[in-house]
């Protein structure tokens, strides 16, 4: 059942960021979501943030206007390196955050459930976010009742 706020927001998004960076399946499952976002917001620019190794797959998904690649392997290599590895990883991620913030997204959907994507959503300071986000202490939060239900099924299915 749609609320008045859902109907009011329909078609108002102009610059959308979709996070689907943790698994190839996230991207493939994002295809119907991308189609729906474009149908409801036909004038919106849709950027997808993906791990560099999955970018070629995204080029074949209709509705994506821009692919922003992040090199997670580089971040992992940095974090496992001695000396300045942590600094290099921080500087790389700081650059990613700064570049994405400069694009002034008005909506973000996090299709991944990883903790670091929730923190990334928090750092981007996008005014309207759905999916996993982080609070001030880095705890993962979900605001959407449907996402809460999905997470409950996934995380408590054993």
Where in the sequence are the language-model features?
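Catalytic machinery of carbohydrate-active enzymes
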Residues: 1-158
């Amino acid at each position: 059942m749609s609320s008045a706020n859902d109907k009011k927001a329909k078609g108002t998004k102009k610059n959308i960021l979709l996070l689907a960076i943790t698994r190839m399946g996230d991207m493939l499952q994002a295809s119907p979501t991308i189609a729906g976002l474009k149908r409801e917001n036909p004038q919106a620019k849709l950027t997808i943030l993906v791990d560099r190794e999955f970018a070629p797959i995204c080029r074949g998904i209709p509705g994506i206007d821009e692919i922003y690649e992040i090199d997670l392997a580089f971040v992992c290599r940095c974090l496992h390196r001695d000396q300045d590895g942590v600094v290099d990883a921080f500087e790389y991620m700081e650059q990613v955050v700064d570049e994405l913030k400069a694009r002034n997204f008005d909506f973000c959907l996090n299709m991944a459930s990883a903790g670091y994507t929730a923190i990334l959503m928090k750092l981007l300071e996008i005014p309207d976010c759905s999916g996993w986000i982080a609070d001030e202490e880095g705890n993962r939060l979900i605001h959407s009742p449907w996402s809460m239900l999905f997470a409950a099924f996934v995380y408590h299915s054993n």
